UniProtKB/Swiss-Prot annotation:
Keyword Repeat part of the UniProt annotation: yes
Disease with which this protein is associated in UniProt: Thyroid cancer, non-medullary, 5: A form of non-medullary thyroid cancer (NMTC), a cancer characterized by tumors originating from the thyroid follicular cells. NMTCs represent approximately 95% of all cases of thyroid cancer and are classified into papillary, follicular, Hurthle cell, and anaplastic neoplasms.
Source organism per UniProt: Homo sapiens (Human)
Gene assigned in the entry: HABP2
PANTHER family linked to this entry: HYALURONAN-BINDING PROTEIN 2, TRYPSIN-RELATED
Protein name per Swiss-Prot or TrEMBL: Factor VII-activating protease
GO molecular function per UniProt: calcium ion binding; glycosaminoglycan binding; peptidase activity; serine-type endopeptidase activity
Cellular component, GO annotation: extracellular region; extracellular space
Lineage start: Eukaryota, Metazoa, Chordata, Craniata, Vertebrata
Tissue specificity remark: Ubiquitously expressed.
Residues covered by the Peptidase S1 domain: 314-555
Subunit structure and binding partners: Heterodimer; disulfide-linked. Heterodimer of a 50 kDa heavy and a 27 kDa light chain linked by a disulfide bond.
């Protein structure tokens, strides 16, 4: 739960792609600007609300490097880069986003604080998407547009389900005496309001914590800087909206919510909601099956149970939702690799089969006895219930892998996992395989990178991050302004042309570059190397060039 309360006064986290080829690290640059900066801090941008503010923003020529104009560009508004329903307007090779209130920023990714003047008195101020872009939720018995009027606390009776209301000496205080089977401040919570498992799917109406504190609404202005609020990516998927009901979007132990402490400070607490009893849960009948001595592959590949919304906040450097990249693997060493890189996570990978992980060859200069692969990991410093850990039985490095002038060529390897209790990875919401590509994706396709942002100094984020990048044609990537014929046919380039430096260097060496088609994700590249992080695109191993080798290696070792 560390990320819920992180200090959020940071530029976007940039991570160095590859090994030692990169000219400098933006991690180091950020640290030089702010000595107190740590890579576990995230930025959820917001601005003070100004009704007259021009919410349109144009990316100008000065913000783009010279190489941006070396080739005819596709329509910069396809796909629409404007978030939260913003309209994209083309201006030559650039674009302008016309933002709907209360959003602003060059891509409408920022949420304006429409509650800064505290217009709600004895109530909560909530940010909305319709004029005046806020509304007041009054604390009973206060009422009125600004929660300044008072009504009798027990007339009419605010208590529900036949409960009786008792007035206290203070006119604003009251107690509801709940009948059996009901609880809550207004006796509104029935006995059937319970959660199953860890409560990830809980959609009940409990809004108080175990310490009987009232939950904040998810669209409260106090939560603008938190990782979890109504304006986060996939909010609807996690049951988060304009309410203050408990939820468990990060798959913690049980549902939780934010509460106000003092001076507009917030913290989180677990909620006063119970786990469902066995009789409350209907389990489907299982038909008998024949015993199997061999674990089959997963039912499907490239499918995530975390749906993507069409309206999103910015990706670069933000904490990823648990289960969004279920094929992401963390390669971890039991020994320090260098003086500056301690033991633990050092590279990424992609699960392509229950017993096989795809990674970069330059990540495999380590003995198998010192190597561990962790699947389903979200927080590197926290042992999570959905993690699956395996030792590595064997490393298969591509035979023609080599490094020339510190640039890796044919940078691809396979890790064969050592089974635990007779099986390798088990499919879950947090652990799934990604598909191997069956064709090419065109230049300009928007793809995803993910990882913990490890640099050559060993520094990075404890939380899994993700970013979006676009595929770039090798002809452009080999131009003099970029890599000047350093890119061969085993490599592909990807970056963010509209805003270089924001997403290009995210991810870990060996981590996946995934592209989506018809709701299925394919591992199209492997994070390999790059020069001048943030100024030039990242370079990835092109997986399609090695499909025959991948399939032949797995077949020869697995017998199928």
């Amino acid at each position: 739960m560390f990320a819920r309360m992180s200090d959020l006064h940071v530029l976007l986290l940039m991570a160095l792609v590859g090994k030692t080829a990169c000219g400098f690290s933006l991690m180091s640059l950020l640290e030089s600007l702010d000595p107190d900066w740590t890579p576990d801090q995230y930025d959820y941008s917001y601005e003070d609300y100004n009704q007259e503010e021009n919410t349109s923003s144009t990316l100008t020529h000065a913000e783009n490097p010279d190489w941006y104009y070396t080739e005819d560009q596709a329509d910069p508004c396809q796909p629409n880069p404007c978030e939260h329903g913003g309209d994209c307007l083309v201006h030559g090779s650039t674009f302008t986003c016309s933002c709907l209130a209360p959003f602003s920023g060059n891509k409408c990714q920022k949420v304006q604080n429409t509650c800064k003047d505290n217009p709600c008195g004895r109530g909560q101020c909530l940010i909305t998407q319709s004029p005046p872009y806020y509304r007041c939720v009054c604390k009973h018995p206060y009422t009125g547009p600004s929660c300044s009027q008072v009504v009798p606390v027990c007339r009419p009776n605010p208590c529900q389900n036949g409960a009786t209301c008792s007035r206290h000496k203070r006119r604003s205080k009251f107690t509801c005496a709940c009948p059996d089977q009901f609880k809550g401040k207004f006796c509104e919570i029935g006995s059937d309001d319970c959660y199953v498992g860890d409560g990830y799917s809980y959609r009940g109406k409990m809004n108080r914590t175990v310490n009987q504190h009232a939950c904040l609404y998810w669209n409260s202005h106090l939560l603008l800087q938190e990782n979890y609020n109504m304006f986060m990516e996939d909010a609807e998927t996690h049951g988060i909206g304009e309410h203050n009901f408990c939820r468990n979007p990060d798959a913690d132990e049980k549902p939780w919510c934010f509460i106000k402490v003092t001076n507009d400070k917030v913290k989180w607490e677990y909620c006063d909601v119970s786990a469902c009893s066995a009789q409350d849960v209907a389990y489907p009948e299982e038909s008998p099956t024949e015993p199997s001595t061999k674990l089959p592959g997963f039912d499907s590949c490239g499918k995530t149970e975390i749906a993507e919304r069409k309206i999103k906040r910015i990706y670069g450097g933000f904490k990823s939702t648990a289960g969004k990249h279920p094929w992401q693997a963390s390669l971890q060493s039991s020994l320090p690799l260098t003086i500056s890189m301690p033991q633990g996570h050092f590279c990424g990978g992609a699960l392509i089969h229950p017993c096989w992980v795809l990674t970069a060859a330059h990540c495999t200069d380590i003995k198998t006895r010192h190597l561990k692969v962790v699947l389903g990991d979200q927080d590197l410093k926290k042992e999570e219930f959905h993690e699956q850990s395996f030792r590595v039985e064997k490393i298969f490095k591509y035979s023609h892998y080599n490094e020339r002038d510190e640039i890796p060529h044919n940078d691809i390897a396979l890790l064969k996992l050592k089974p635990v209790d007779g099986h390798c990875a088990l499919e879950s919401k947090y652990v799934k395989t990604v598909c191997l590509p069956d064709g090419s994706f065109p230049s300009g396709s928007e793809c995803h990178i993910s990882g913990w942002g490890v640099t050559e100094t060993g520094k990075g984020s404890r939380q899994l991050l993700d970013a979006k990048v676009k595929l770039i044609a090798n002809t452009l990537c080999n131009s003099r302004q970029l890599y000047d014929h350093m890119i061969d046919d085993s490599m592909i380039c990807a970056g963010n042309l509209q805003k270089p430096g924001q997403d290009t260097c995210q991810g870990d060496s060996g981590g996946p570059l995934t592209c989506e088609k018809d709701g299925t994700y394919y591992v199209y590249g492997i994070v390999s190397w790059g020069l001048e992080c943030g100024k030039r695109p990242g370079v990835y191993t092109q997986v399609t060039k090695f499909l025959n080798w991948i399939k032949a290696t797995i077949k020869s070792e697995s017998g199928f």
